[in-house]
A protein has these predicted regions:
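Residues that form or immediately flank small-molecule/cofactor binding pockets and catalytic motifs
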Residues: 8-11, 109, 123
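Structured loop/turn residues at beta-strand edges in well-structured enzyme cores
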Residues: 1, 86, 114, 149
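Structured beta-strand/loop patches that form or line metal/cofactor-binding pockets in enzymes
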Residues: 1-31, 35
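Metal-dependent enolase-superfamily TIM-barrel catalytic cores that perform enediolate-based chemistry
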Residues: 115, 120-177
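Flexible hinge/switch segments at interdomain interfaces of large molecular machines
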Residues: 108-115
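Metal- or metallocofactor-binding catalytic centers and their adjacent structured scaffolds
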Residues: 25-100
Length: 177
């Protein structure tokens, strides 16, 4: 199965999220995603990685990763280049899972637990408008809303004024910190 097209998608409602759809000659489409500065990541995918991927075998996942990494590793181990590699990697694993009729976790060694706890990251997705609540100093209100939906943990940004937005130890004692 060959890679025929790399399609990047971002929408105004989630302005920092990028989705990648990798199309194949057999009609399967793999989906990958990343967060932050989507146009920069899309540029790396289209301007740098397209030549490494288009027309190539989908299932050479490790080889694709190594080729992408060796092409951009002089930029370091972070930034748009690494997010682009990750996005492509996820989409390729998605394609392999679809082709084999298996969830990706089976391909990566199998399930090791039946349930996992989830947490919320303040990035304005869904009904909570998390990022805006955090920026406007309403993190405590956001935490209460999340608790009401069963989400018991929230990741806040390291530069957040924790003592102000959640009331520090007082907020924790109140069940929202």
């Amino acid at each position: 199965m060959k890679i025929t097209k790399l399609e990047t998608i971002w929408i105004d409602e989630q302005f920092n999220t990028l989705w990648l759809r990798i199309h194949t000659d057999e009609g399967l489409i793999g989906l990958g995603e990343t967060y932050y500065v989507p146009r920069a990541v899309a540029a790396v995918i289209h301007d740098v990685f397209a030549n490494l991927l288009l027309g190539r075998e989908v299932f050479d996942i490790e080889n694709h990763w190594n080729n992408m990494f060796s092409t951009v590793n002089f930029f370091g181990f972070a930034g748009a280049e690494m997010r682009a590699i990750s996005t492509v990697d996820v989409a390729l694993w998605d394609l392999l899972g679809q082709y084999l009729g298996q969830p990706i976790y089976n391909l990566l060694g199998g399930r090791n637990r039946d349930r996992i706890r989830i947490y919320n990251t303040c990035v304005s997705h869904g009904p909570h408008q998390d990022y805006h609540a955090w920026m406007e100093g309403r993190a405590g209100q956001l935490a209460e809303e999340l608790l009401a939906t069963g989400i018991r943990a929230m990741k806040i940004w390291p530069w957040d004024q924790f003592g102000v937005s959640l009331g520090g130890p007082i907020g924790r004692r109140a069940g929202v910190g």
